Amino acid sequence: MEISTPLDCAPALVGPLPRRNSRAAQIRWGDRVVHVGGDAPVCVQSMTNTDTSDAIGTAIQVKELARAGSELVRITVDTPAAAAAVPAIREQLDRMGVDVPLVGDFHYNGHKLLQDYPECAQALSKYRINPGNVGQGAKRDTQFAQMIEIACRYDKPVRIGVNWGSLDQDLLARIMDENAQRATPWDARAVMVEALITSAIQSAQKAEELGLPGSQIILSCKVSAVQDLIAVYRELARRCHYALHLGLTEAGMGSKGIVASTAALSVLLQEGIGDTIRISLTPEPGAPREKEVIVAQEILQTMGLRNFTPMVIACPGCGRTTSTVFQELAARIQSYLREQMPVWKEQYPGVEEMNVAVMGCIVNGPGESKHANIGISLPGTGESPAAPVFVDGVKVKTLRGERITEEFQAIVDEYVRTHYGAQTPATV
């Protein structure tokens, strides 16, 4: 068997491709400006699942999503009661000091709601329009134009969001007819991809003709199959320069939804495609809505595209780690770091880049701990009941006894205070 010899040059290191050149949009509320596209970092957004007519309940959930790190929050605006509640939601948020921009999600009757409730139109920072259900036949163009004209009047960006489950049926029928005339017809998936892209780009071009600047337009073409989403966005990115919103629609619940969204979005983000993302998870009954924000952040952070919170490195456990102490410590530290971030990110710039290692035995524990900013190697089965702690690669102490968790957390706090700022962090 032939064994290859080492190369004279260093191995090639893989990183994301340069970001696609897209137009930069600005979503504003008060002094808060969220940049989407251009050279801005990929933005994280989310969506409420409250009844929007419940202004207090919706404002509370928006606050929770924003506190988790959502930079834009979308709310459903589907009824007169919902439209009437939007200004009250915005007012409640402003009173609470939450300046996250709100995006209004419109289907079927958006033209009428925006026209009849101008205070709603002004309180929103961005509109989402679905060209597949904005109207049928001649009404479609008229009602689409009404929404774009209101966006122009109030200087609001628009996301033209096409979804495979609500495609413009007239457009789809035309593309299917054209396909039937081909010498070698495309398969059904290719036709669907073409219909999605055509709907998005033609709608964007129409919006520009109506006076909406191209820098105020964001596009999305959502499907529920991973490979189809990748194909759609690769082609959409090739054909236009609008900012792109990425998301796998109806991703599902639990680990399936997380895996599917991660599989699709990671490929596109690695190729430099995507300016803002949303993870469409179906929450477990009673589960916090903020989970979709955390997953979006973790995708971007693990890919090295953005940093949101200190990263906890922990081993998976094996027969050497029959104790659950390291698992409990890793979970507690991860939770603690995330809880502190709303305060720490203001007081200690750069803390989001910190790495913390919580390891379960002597095999990889000391090595991983030395490579982290702070690391602890807990004893495995049969090992000495001692946990060495490393700070910036240097062993600083060994913890023993029943208060290892509290003592290690205190070391983390001290590191943050001394390396990222001079003030003592407030508790959240």
UniProtKB/Swiss-Prot annotation:
NCBIfam families (UniProt xref): ispG_gcpE, PRK00366.1
Residues reported in the UniProt entry to bind [4Fe-4S] cluster: 315, 318, 361, 368
Pathway(s) this gene product operates in, as recorded in its UniProt entry: Isoprenoid biosynthesis; isopentenyl diphosphate biosynthesis via DXP pathway; isopentenyl diphosphate from 1-deoxy-D-xylulose 5-phosphate: step 5/6
Keywords: 4Fe-4S, Iron, Iron-sulfur, Isoprene biosynthesis, Metal-binding, Oxidoreductase
PANTHER family the UniProt entry points to: 4-HYDROXY-3-METHYLBUT-2-EN-1-YL DIPHOSPHATE SYNTHASE, 4-HYDROXY-3-METHYLBUT-2-EN-1-YL DIPHOSPHATE SYNTHASE (FERREDOXIN), CHLOROPLASTIC
Record-listed E.C. numbers: 1.17.7.3
UniProt remark on cofactor binding: Binds 1 [4Fe-4S] cluster.
The name this protein goes by in its record: 4-hydroxy-3-methylbut-2-en-1-yl diphosphate synthase (flavodoxin)
InterPro entries assigned to the protein according to its UniProt record, in alphabetical order: Dihydropteroate_synth-like_sf, IspG_bac, IspG_bac-typ, NO2/SO3_Rdtase_4Fe4S_sf
GO biological process: isopentenyl diphosphate biosynthetic process, methylerythritol 4-phosphate pathway; terpenoid biosynthetic process
Cofactor(s) the protein needs: [4Fe-4S] cluster
Keyword Heme: no
Family: Belongs to the IspG family.
Catalytic function, reaction form: (2E)-4-hydroxy-3-methylbut-2-enyl diphosphate + oxidized [flavodoxin] + H2O + 2 H(+) = 2-C-methyl-D-erythritol 2,4-cyclic diphosphate + reduced [flavodoxin]
Pfam families: GcpE (PF04551)
Organism: Ralstonia pickettii (strain 12J)
